């Protein structure tokens, strides 16, 4: 039993360390021009379409006021627009602009390039195993 306990400890330590490294490296790529939260909002809008500002707070696990600040910055950069609902004028939805789509595409390419470099040392078989293990871990939630 001690061996398994040590394995769990080692796994937890390595997961935390590796995910922190990857997060920091991706933030380094993004932070020169946009924050991780700005990138995530653009990605969600591109994939899922217009959303109310309040829908992002639980997704990003931040306060509504933080989302307002992030969306204000995105509006200022002209990467998103705010549009009032015609049915209920109190509801404002944010939409990604063409410029926002271009920025998102640019950073998606940079992120893909990063992952190719980061995992270049692994064979296709090793990557397939890693994907299989993470998929299995994801299903355990």
Curated annotation (Swiss-Prot):
Domain HTH marR-type: 4-139
The keyword Chaperone is annotated on this UniProt entry: no
Protein encoded by which gene: ypoP
Keywords, ordered alphabetically: DNA-binding, Transcription, Transcription regulation
Residue spans binding DNA: 53-76
InterPro entries: HTH_MarR-typ, MarR/SlyA-like, WH-like_DNA-bd_sf, WH_DNA-bd_sf
Domain of life the protein comes from: Bacteria
Organism: Bacillus subtilis (strain 168)
Protein's name in the database: Uncharacterized HTH-type transcriptional regulator YpoP
GO molecular function per UniProt: DNA binding; DNA-binding transcription factor activity
Any one Gene Ontology BP term: response to stress
Keyword check for Transferase: no
